[in-house]
Swiss-Prot record:
Keywords linked to the UniProt accession: ATP synthesis, CF(0), Chloroplast, Hydrogen ion transport, Ion transport, Lipid-binding, Membrane, Plastid, Thylakoid, Transmembrane, Transmembrane helix, Transport
Other observations noted: In plastids the F-type ATPase is also known as CF(1)CF(0).
InterPro entries: ATP_synth_csu_bac/chlpt, ATP_synth_F0_csu, ATP_synth_F0_csu_DDCD_BS, ATP_synth_F0_csu_sf, ATPase_proteolipid_c-like_dom, F/V-ATP_Csub_sf
General function of this protein: F(1)F(0) ATP synthase produces ATP from ADP in the presence of a proton or sodium gradient. F-type ATPases consist of two structural domains, F(1) containing the extramembraneous catalytic core and F(0) containing the membrane proton channel, linked together by a central stalk and a peripheral stalk. During catalysis, ATP synthesis in the catalytic domain of F(1) is coupled via a rotary mechanism of the central stalk subunits to proton translocation. Key component of the F(0) channel; it plays a direct role in translocation across the membrane. A homomeric c-ring of between 10-14 subunits forms the central stalk rotor element with the F(1) delta and epsilon subunits.
SUPFAM superfamilies from the UniProt entry: F1F0 ATP synthase subunit C (SSF81333)
Annotated organism of origin: Arabidopsis thaliana
Record protein name field: ATP synthase subunit c, chloroplastic
GO molecular function, one term: lipid binding
Classification of source organism: Eukaryota, Viridiplantae, Streptophyta, Embryophyta, Tracheophyta
One Pfam family matching this protein: ATP-synt_C
GO cellular component: chloroplast thylakoid; chloroplast thylakoid membrane; proton-transporting ATP synthase complex; proton-transporting two-sector ATPase complex, proton-transporting domain
Annotated site, Reversibly protonated during proton transport, chain positions: 61
Domain of life of the native organism: Eukaryota
Subcellular location: Plastid, Chloroplast thylakoid membrane
Amino acid sequence: MNPLVSAASVIAAGLAVGLASIGPGVGQGTAAGQAVEGIARQPEAEGKIRGTLLLSLAFMEALTIYGLVVALALLFANPFV
């Protein structure tokens, strides 16, 4: 096994997880902040806002999980070796 390929795979795995976490992290923070603001403005719509928020947070978190899957594939099922 080429050590350069192994080192590049480890670096790519770290970048995959790190970069895949930035966007959803910012999006989740923004969505949660807007949900709290919406509930503060209209308390009677809390259930609807909360349900929509939880669904959107799940979709955003899926992006991070995809990055983790790519990183695990690079580390343990490396197609470049």
